[in-house]
Amino acid sequence: MRFTALLIFVFVCVAGYSQSFDTVQIRAIKLTDKIHMLKGSGGNIGLLSGGDGLLMIDDQFAPLSEKISKAIAGIDGGPVRFLVNTHIHGDHTGGNENFKQLGVTLVAHDFVRDRMMKESVNLRTNATNPPRDKAAWPEITFADRMNFHLNDEDIELHHFTNGHTDGDIVIRFVKANVYHVGDLFNRTSFPYIDAGNGGNFSGLLVNLDKILALIDDNAKVIPGHGNLATKADVNAYRDMLYELHDNVAKAMKSGKKIEDIPALNLTAKYDDVFGKGFIKGKDFILIVAQAVAAEKTEKKTKK
Protein backbone atom coordinates (compact mmCIF):
# COMPACT_ATOMS: atom_id res chain seq x y z
CA MET A 1 0.00 0.00 0.00
CA ARG A 2 2.86 2.38 0.78
CA PHE A 3 4.37 1.95 -2.67
CA THR A 4 0.97 2.27 -4.32
CA ALA A 5 0.44 5.53 -2.46
CA LEU A 6 3.84 6.75 -3.59
CA LEU A 7 3.09 5.98 -7.22
CA ILE A 8 -0.13 8.01 -7.03
CA PHE A 9 1.63 10.89 -5.31
CA VAL A 10 4.54 10.92 -7.74
CA PHE A 11 2.26 10.80 -10.78
CA VAL A 12 0.88 14.17 -9.71
CA CYS A 13 4.40 15.56 -9.22
CA VAL A 14 5.72 14.24 -12.53
CA ALA A 15 2.90 15.81 -14.49
CA GLY A 16 4.38 19.24 -13.79
CA TYR A 17 7.80 18.38 -15.18
CA SER A 18 9.26 18.16 -18.64
CA GLN A 19 8.93 14.75 -20.28
CA SER A 20 12.72 14.48 -20.68
CA PHE A 21 12.79 11.69 -18.08
CA ASP A 22 10.34 9.49 -20.00
CA THR A 23 13.04 7.35 -21.59
CA VAL A 24 15.12 6.91 -18.42
CA GLN A 25 15.28 3.34 -17.17
CA ILE A 26 16.21 2.41 -13.61
CA ARG A 27 18.61 -0.53 -13.55
CA ALA A 28 19.28 -2.47 -10.35
CA ILE A 29 22.69 -4.08 -9.88
CA LYS A 30 23.00 -6.70 -7.15
CA LEU A 31 26.12 -6.24 -5.01
CA THR A 32 25.23 -8.64 -2.18
CA ASP A 33 22.09 -10.50 -1.12
CA LYS A 34 20.89 -7.35 0.67
CA ILE A 35 22.61 -4.45 -1.12
CA HIS A 36 21.86 -3.11 -4.59
CA MET A 37 23.05 -0.18 -6.65
CA LEU A 38 20.43 1.55 -8.81
CA LYS A 39 21.39 3.53 -11.90
CA GLY A 40 19.14 5.89 -13.82
CA SER A 41 19.60 9.62 -14.38
CA GLY A 42 21.43 11.50 -11.66
CA GLY A 43 23.44 10.15 -8.79
CA ASN A 44 23.76 6.43 -8.15
CA ILE A 45 21.35 5.04 -5.54
CA GLY A 46 22.33 2.55 -2.86
CA LEU A 47 19.74 0.25 -1.29
CA LEU A 48 19.89 -1.99 1.78
CA SER A 49 16.91 -4.35 2.01
CA GLY A 50 15.62 -6.70 4.69
CA GLY A 51 12.93 -7.33 7.25
CA ASP A 52 13.78 -4.26 9.34
CA GLY A 53 12.82 -1.99 6.46
CA LEU A 54 14.83 -0.48 3.63
CA LEU A 55 17.60 2.09 3.80
CA MET A 56 18.05 4.08 0.62
CA ILE A 57 20.97 6.34 -0.33
CA ASP A 58 20.10 9.28 -2.62
CA ASP A 59 17.01 9.54 -4.82
CA GLN A 60 17.96 11.25 -8.10
CA PHE A 61 15.30 13.58 -9.62
CA ALA A 62 11.67 14.00 -8.52
CA PRO A 63 10.17 12.88 -11.87
CA LEU A 64 11.95 9.54 -11.48
CA SER A 65 10.49 8.66 -8.08
CA GLU A 66 7.81 6.43 -9.60
CA LYS A 67 10.34 4.45 -11.63
CA ILE A 68 12.72 4.21 -8.69
CA SER A 69 9.89 2.99 -6.47
CA LYS A 70 8.95 0.29 -8.97
CA ALA A 71 12.57 -0.85 -9.17
CA ILE A 72 12.79 -1.00 -5.38
CA ALA A 73 9.53 -2.95 -5.17
CA GLY A 74 11.02 -5.48 -7.57
CA ILE A 75 13.87 -6.05 -5.11
CA ASP A 76 11.98 -5.87 -1.81
CA GLY A 77 8.34 -4.97 -1.30
CA GLY A 78 8.93 -3.65 2.19
CA PRO A 79 8.78 0.03 3.14
CA VAL A 80 11.69 2.44 2.77
CA ARG A 81 12.36 3.57 6.35
CA PHE A 82 15.39 5.80 5.88
CA LEU A 83 16.67 7.90 2.99
CA VAL A 84 20.25 9.16 3.35
CA ASN A 85 21.47 12.08 1.21
CA THR A 86 25.18 12.01 0.36
CA HIS A 87 25.10 15.80 -0.20
CA ILE A 88 22.78 18.63 -1.20
CA HIS A 89 22.67 18.54 -5.01
CA GLY A 90 19.33 18.04 -6.72
CA ASP A 91 20.42 15.06 -8.82
CA HIS A 92 20.87 13.22 -5.49
CA THR A 93 18.06 14.79 -3.43
CA GLY A 94 15.40 15.69 -6.00
CA GLY A 95 13.02 12.98 -4.82
CA ASN A 96 13.18 13.89 -1.13
CA GLU A 97 9.71 15.42 -1.05
CA ASN A 98 8.13 12.41 -2.74
CA PHE A 99 9.59 9.86 -0.36
CA LYS A 100 9.05 12.00 2.72
CA GLN A 101 5.37 12.21 1.76
CA LEU A 102 5.15 8.54 2.73
CA GLY A 103 6.79 9.03 6.10
CA VAL A 104 10.29 8.03 5.02
CA THR A 105 12.83 9.62 7.40
CA LEU A 106 15.43 11.80 5.67
CA VAL A 107 19.01 11.75 6.98
CA ALA A 108 21.96 13.94 5.99
CA HIS A 109 24.84 16.03 7.27
CA ASP A 110 24.03 19.14 9.31
CA PHE A 111 25.15 21.41 6.47
CA VAL A 112 22.78 19.80 3.97
CA ARG A 113 19.74 20.79 6.02
CA ASP A 114 21.22 24.23 6.76
CA ARG A 115 21.76 24.95 3.08
CA MET A 116 18.40 23.59 1.95
CA MET A 117 16.74 26.08 4.28
CA LYS A 118 18.46 29.08 2.67
CA GLU A 119 18.80 30.80 -0.68
CA SER A 120 22.01 29.85 -2.49
CA VAL A 121 24.05 31.10 -5.44
CA ASN A 122 25.54 28.89 -8.15
CA LEU A 123 28.98 30.41 -8.62
CA ARG A 124 29.38 28.80 -12.06
CA THR A 125 26.26 30.46 -13.49
CA ASN A 126 25.62 33.23 -10.92
CA ALA A 127 22.05 31.91 -10.73
CA THR A 128 20.22 32.33 -7.43
CA ASN A 129 18.45 29.25 -6.11
CA PRO A 130 15.56 29.63 -3.65
CA PRO A 131 15.40 27.54 -0.47
CA ARG A 132 14.19 23.98 -0.97
CA ASP A 133 10.64 23.18 0.05
CA LYS A 134 10.44 22.20 3.71
CA ALA A 135 9.36 18.70 2.71
CA ALA A 136 12.85 18.13 1.29
CA TRP A 137 14.70 18.99 4.49
CA PRO A 138 16.39 16.13 6.36
CA GLU A 139 14.79 15.36 9.72
CA ILE A 140 17.87 13.72 11.24
CA THR A 141 21.30 15.29 10.82
CA PHE A 142 24.76 14.76 12.24
CA ALA A 143 28.17 16.43 12.32
CA ASP A 144 31.00 13.89 12.05
CA ARG A 145 29.77 10.33 12.54
CA MET A 146 26.51 8.42 12.79
CA ASN A 147 25.67 4.70 12.98
CA PHE A 148 22.71 2.55 11.92
CA HIS A 149 22.16 -1.08 12.87
CA LEU A 150 19.62 -2.47 10.43
CA ASN A 151 18.95 -5.79 8.69
CA ASP A 152 21.89 -7.46 10.45
CA GLU A 153 24.19 -4.83 8.98
CA ASP A 154 26.27 -2.15 10.67
CA ILE A 155 26.18 1.10 8.71
CA GLU A 156 28.58 3.96 9.37
CA LEU A 157 28.06 7.50 8.09
CA HIS A 158 31.26 9.55 7.95
CA HIS A 159 31.87 13.23 7.30
CA PHE A 160 35.53 14.14 6.94
CA THR A 161 35.81 17.73 5.68
CA ASN A 162 34.67 20.04 2.88
CA GLY A 163 35.19 18.49 -0.56
CA HIS A 164 32.72 18.40 -3.44
CA THR A 165 30.50 20.43 -1.06
CA ASP A 166 30.68 21.01 2.69
CA GLY A 167 28.10 18.32 3.48
CA ASP A 168 29.52 15.26 1.71
CA ILE A 169 29.30 11.97 3.56
CA VAL A 170 30.61 8.44 3.03
CA ILE A 171 28.33 5.51 3.87
CA ARG A 172 30.02 2.27 4.90
CA PHE A 173 28.27 -1.10 5.09
CA VAL A 174 30.74 -2.75 7.44
CA LYS A 175 29.84 -6.44 7.13
CA ALA A 176 29.21 -6.32 3.39
CA ASN A 177 32.35 -4.24 2.69
CA VAL A 178 30.36 -1.90 0.46
CA TYR A 179 30.75 1.89 0.36
CA HIS A 180 28.72 4.72 -1.15
CA VAL A 181 30.95 7.78 -1.49
CA GLY A 182 28.67 10.19 -3.35
CA ASP A 183 30.28 12.79 -5.57
CA LEU A 184 33.57 12.68 -3.71
CA PHE A 185 34.34 10.14 -6.45
CA ASN A 186 32.85 10.61 -9.92
CA ARG A 187 33.77 8.14 -12.65
CA THR A 188 32.19 10.15 -15.48
CA SER A 189 33.68 13.64 -15.05
CA PHE A 190 36.42 15.71 -13.53
CA PRO A 191 35.35 16.79 -10.03
CA TYR A 192 32.86 19.59 -9.59
CA ILE A 193 33.99 21.74 -6.67
CA ASP A 194 30.83 23.58 -5.63
CA ALA A 195 32.34 26.56 -3.81
CA GLY A 196 28.90 28.10 -3.42
CA ASN A 197 27.97 25.14 -1.23
CA GLY A 198 31.26 25.04 0.66
CA GLY A 199 33.26 22.88 -1.76
CA ASN A 200 37.04 22.92 -1.59
CA PHE A 201 39.55 21.18 -3.89
CA SER A 202 42.20 20.72 -1.22
CA GLY A 203 39.51 19.24 1.00
CA LEU A 204 38.48 16.83 -1.76
CA LEU A 205 42.02 15.44 -1.72
CA VAL A 206 41.78 14.99 2.04
CA ASN A 207 38.46 13.18 1.62
CA LEU A 208 39.91 10.79 -0.94
CA ASP A 209 42.88 10.06 1.32
CA LYS A 210 40.46 9.30 4.17
CA ILE A 211 38.33 7.05 1.97
CA LEU A 212 41.37 5.09 0.81
CA ALA A 213 42.48 4.64 4.41
CA LEU A 214 39.05 3.23 5.24
CA ILE A 215 38.54 0.72 2.43
CA ASP A 216 40.41 -2.45 1.48
CA ASP A 217 41.23 -4.11 -1.84
CA ASN A 218 38.06 -6.23 -1.79
CA ALA A 219 35.64 -3.36 -1.17
CA LYS A 220 32.84 -2.51 -3.58
CA VAL A 221 32.58 1.25 -4.07
CA ILE A 222 29.45 3.00 -5.35
CA PRO A 223 30.56 6.30 -6.90
CA GLY A 224 28.35 9.35 -7.21
CA HIS A 225 28.17 8.74 -10.97
CA GLY A 226 29.38 5.92 -13.18
CA ASN A 227 29.92 2.22 -12.77
CA LEU A 228 30.69 0.27 -9.62
CA ALA A 229 34.31 0.71 -8.58
CA THR A 230 37.13 -0.78 -6.52
CA LYS A 231 39.77 0.68 -4.26
CA ALA A 232 42.17 0.66 -7.22
CA ASP A 233 39.78 2.92 -9.15
CA VAL A 234 39.52 5.39 -6.27
CA ASN A 235 43.29 5.32 -5.86
CA ALA A 236 43.85 6.08 -9.55
CA TYR A 237 41.37 8.98 -9.37
CA ARG A 238 43.10 10.38 -6.27
CA ASP A 239 46.53 10.03 -7.90
CA MET A 240 45.30 11.87 -11.00
CA LEU A 241 44.12 14.80 -8.89
CA TYR A 242 47.39 15.00 -6.98
CA GLU A 243 49.33 14.86 -10.24
CA LEU A 244 47.30 17.70 -11.75
CA HIS A 245 47.64 19.70 -8.54
CA ASP A 246 51.42 19.27 -8.52
CA ASN A 247 51.78 20.12 -12.21
CA VAL A 248 49.75 23.29 -11.75
CA ALA A 249 51.85 24.23 -8.70
CA LYS A 250 55.06 23.77 -10.73
CA ALA A 251 53.71 25.90 -13.57
CA MET A 252 52.68 28.69 -11.22
CA LYS A 253 56.00 28.54 -9.40
CA SER A 254 57.71 29.08 -12.78
CA GLY A 255 55.72 32.27 -13.27
CA LYS A 256 52.45 31.21 -14.88
CA LYS A 257 49.35 33.05 -13.71
CA ILE A 258 45.99 31.45 -12.97
CA GLU A 259 44.58 32.53 -16.32
CA ASP A 260 47.55 30.96 -18.15
CA ILE A 261 46.98 27.46 -16.79
CA PRO A 262 44.10 26.21 -19.03
CA ALA A 263 46.18 26.80 -22.17
CA LEU A 264 48.81 24.32 -20.93
CA ASN A 265 46.42 21.39 -21.55
CA LEU A 266 47.56 19.63 -18.39
CA THR A 267 44.49 17.37 -18.35
CA ALA A 268 45.04 16.10 -21.93
CA LYS A 269 45.85 12.48 -21.06
CA TYR A 270 42.73 12.22 -18.89
CA ASP A 271 40.26 14.06 -21.13
CA ASP A 272 39.04 10.96 -22.97
CA VAL A 273 37.85 9.44 -19.69
CA PHE A 274 36.84 12.42 -17.56
CA GLY A 275 36.63 15.35 -19.99
CA LYS A 276 33.34 14.38 -21.60
CA GLY A 277 31.25 14.86 -18.48
CA PHE A 278 29.77 17.82 -16.65
CA ILE A 279 33.14 19.47 -15.93
CA LYS A 280 35.60 19.83 -18.81
CA GLY A 281 39.36 19.67 -18.41
CA LYS A 282 40.03 23.38 -18.92
CA ASP A 283 37.30 24.32 -16.44
CA PHE A 284 38.60 21.89 -13.86
CA ILE A 285 42.25 22.87 -14.17
CA LEU A 286 41.25 26.48 -13.54
CA ILE A 287 39.66 25.33 -10.26
CA VAL A 288 42.92 23.58 -9.38
CA ALA A 289 44.91 26.73 -10.18
CA GLN A 290 42.68 28.79 -7.92
CA ALA A 291 43.17 26.22 -5.15
CA VAL A 292 46.95 26.31 -5.56
CA ALA A 293 46.92 30.11 -5.40
CA ALA A 294 44.79 29.97 -2.24
CA GLU A 295 47.21 27.49 -0.65
CA LYS A 296 50.11 29.82 -1.45
CA THR A 297 48.30 32.78 0.12
CA GLU A 298 47.46 30.72 3.20
CA LYS A 299 51.10 29.73 3.67
CA LYS A 300 52.18 33.37 3.47
CA THR A 301 49.53 34.34 6.02
CA LYS A 302 50.77 31.72 8.48
CA LYS A 303 54.38 32.92 8.30
Language-model segments: what does each one mean?
Residues 1-19:
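Bacterial Sec-dependent N-terminal signal peptides
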Residues 30-31, 53-54, 61-63, 113-160, 165-166, 174-175, ...:
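Metallo-beta-lactamase
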Residues 27-72, 171-172, 177-181:
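Conserved beta-strand hairpin/beta-sheet module of binuclear metal-dependent hydrolase folds
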Residues 51-52, 63-107:
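Active-site metal-binding motif and surrounding structural segment of the metallo-beta-lactamase
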Residues 42-45, 54-56, 61-64, 88-93, ...:
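Solvent-exposed loop/turn segments at secondary-structure junctions
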Residues 14-19, 213-215, 228-303:
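Accessory terminal helices/loops
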Residues 34, 48, 58, 72, ...:
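Divalent metal-coordination and catalytic microenvironments
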